[in-house]
From Swiss-Prot:
It comes from Mus musculus. One of its GO terms (molecular function) is K63-linked polyubiquitin modification-dependent protein binding. The modification Phosphothreonine is found at residue 233. One of its GO terms (biological process) is ribosome-associated ubiquitin-dependent protein catabolic process. Belongs to the ASCC2 family. Residues 649-662 have a biased composition (Acidic residues). The CUE domain specifically binds RPS20/uS10 ubiquitinated via 'Lys-63'-linked ubiquitin chains by ZNF598. CDD domains: CUE_ASCC2 (cd14364). This is Activating signal cointegrator 1 complex subunit 2. GO terms for cellular component: cytosolic ribosome; DNA repair complex; nuclear speck; nucleus; RQC-trigger complex.
Amino acid sequence: MPALPLDQLQITHKDPKTGQPKTSAALNPEQKADRYFVLYKPPPKDNIPALVEEYLERANFVANDLDWLLALPHDKFWCQVIFDETLQKCLDSYLHYVPRKFDEWVAPTPEVADMQNHLHRSVFLTFLRMSTHKESKDHFISPSAFGEILYNNFLFDIPKILDLCVLFGKGNSPLLQKMIGNIFTQQPSYYTDLDETIPTILQVFSNILQHCGLQGDGTSTTPQKLGERSPLTPSDMPLLELKDIVLYLCDTSTTLWAFLDIFPLACQTFQKHDFCYRLASFYEMAIPELESAIKKRRLEDSKLLGDMWQRLSHSKKKLMEVFHIILNQICLLPILESSCDNIQGFIEEFLQIFSSLLQEKRFLRDYDTFSPVAEDISLLQQASSALDETRTAYILQAVESAWEGVDRQKIKDIKDPPRAKGSNNEVTVTAEPVSEMPSQLENLEEDEECMGAAAALGPAVSGVELDSLISQVKDLLPDLGEGFILACLEHYSYDSEQVINNILEDRLAPELSQLDRGLERQVKPDPTPLLSSRHNIFQNDEFDVFSRDSVDLSRVHKGRRKEENVRSLVNDKQAVVAQWQRYQKYSVVVEEVPLQPGEYQADDYEDEYDDTYDGNQVGANDADSDDELISRRPFTIPQVLRTKMPGEVQEEEWDEEDEVEEEAPKPDHFIQDPAVLREKAEARRMAFLARKGYRPENSTAVTGGPRGHGQSRETTQERRKKEANKAARANHNRRTMADRKRSKGMIPS
């Protein structure tokens, strides 16, 4: 007889009241054991014995109850899970309060770390069994009833699934993928819940922007109250408030990435809400402001700011991965898996997503660094021959323009950490490293980002200050080497107190614990010593002892040479002989040129010929040929030296029509009457203007008659006209504008 599923199974048991056998459903509240599950509380941050003891006692109760629950048979387990509310509250409290791997928590004692790992494993196995509808061929639940049990009893919901992914995703990815996939497969209503949850996730981004003063309430039409303060920007808000925002962003981005990495089928639901564009817009507005705010506070608390910078870098990386997972799931993977006839829709979706992001310059740069856009477009070109080259070229050009003015340094992609492998019937659980130093964010951050954060927060300690820190540690722990102390100081941001405390409590980081404690300090050579970087006229010559090891000492002589005297030095013509070949090549020095009889050397200079006055046409000249006489310019007397001939006419400079003037009178060297000269000049000017057709205005009316005798009507009109038209005489229109102002009533009359 085949076994029945648990939801249809009937069991017979004795009625405690009547003692008679009674048949009831296997999933019955009466089958629930009377057991109270205590709530989980997070471990203490400080090593206070009372707090540690309280935590260990409570955690021990929770661990024992979960171990008892996991040991129950199939029907008893599901009765306890469905009908015991204290169990659900206990599991919810663990998901709510357990420290994440990016939280600021360090296990105060090894006992606390062991207990935390035990609880971590037990909670994961409990949820894993709750998500399995078939444990064996005899113990199973029908799929339809299983989905109803999960959904109607709130055993799983979207927030729980998100917490499960972020808490247990590392090292347990295959189990989580099977677990969450089974939940969504057996109960499709969870897709509807996820669709209703995504607006809340988008509201988280809006809340961060509003809290940073980067986005106002667009739905509000009422004006802001006078007494109401506008939100502070990240650069102005207190440091602890900025820290809370960074932690909130880190939690949100890590949770989203963990969920989509485990369950990528949810990407279609996310993209229904235009999630890619909303994510890129949030990234463009929030990330640069938060980075700038942290860099501006480099002098406040270097340790806290370094931790915040690492968390912000981690958030950036996870947001990039979220975008990449969605793009890869809804566009690229279907293109690779589909035939050529069905990929046009996916290609159009890819181009549409990037076309909406072209104005987000910072996001495009960071995503192009994380995953080059050109490679994705190259994949599209290989998959389809009908790809719109204009749109792809436009997208690539926009990505290149986003890099303008920025040093393009590619960062190596970080490989995913290895995941635990397990068979179908073998449960493999890797506990989270809750006891490790969270501020380092191990296995989360790339080395380049950490180094960039350290560089941005200020220069490293060096010189006398570094020697002082080393001596502080060495005075208390003299057996340690200076090299080991220096490595500890560099790891803990040059905090000598933290170094001493961690050494005494044996809580050093793993990379420091492996070092030799007697390691001596190594002197770092100067990268650019002066001797190797100098440059002068003796650089690399035969006597430069800094660039060569051996020098010919026979060429070096100190003092006066005794073998030679001044006469022998003067008679030494070796230098002249050495230059002879050079001058001979260029034919500069020629002593004698042999000539054959009858030859004439035209270049020779003849003393009998004197050409001193040839240029001035003075003296006896040789007879010239007819062609030379024709082509030569005739000699003329300069105009300044000429004497005016009686019949010659003179043209005035201002006569543009070349009209012939009357013959000028003979120059008179005596001084004439100035009044006569002025009259002649005025006559010449009037004659010139008359030829031009210029008619001067009659200004006699403006001049007027003598004072006290009155003015004529023409004089009064001309003066009024002159007063009104002063602007035409470069008076800048002051009178007209003054009248205009007065007519408008701006100036009292």
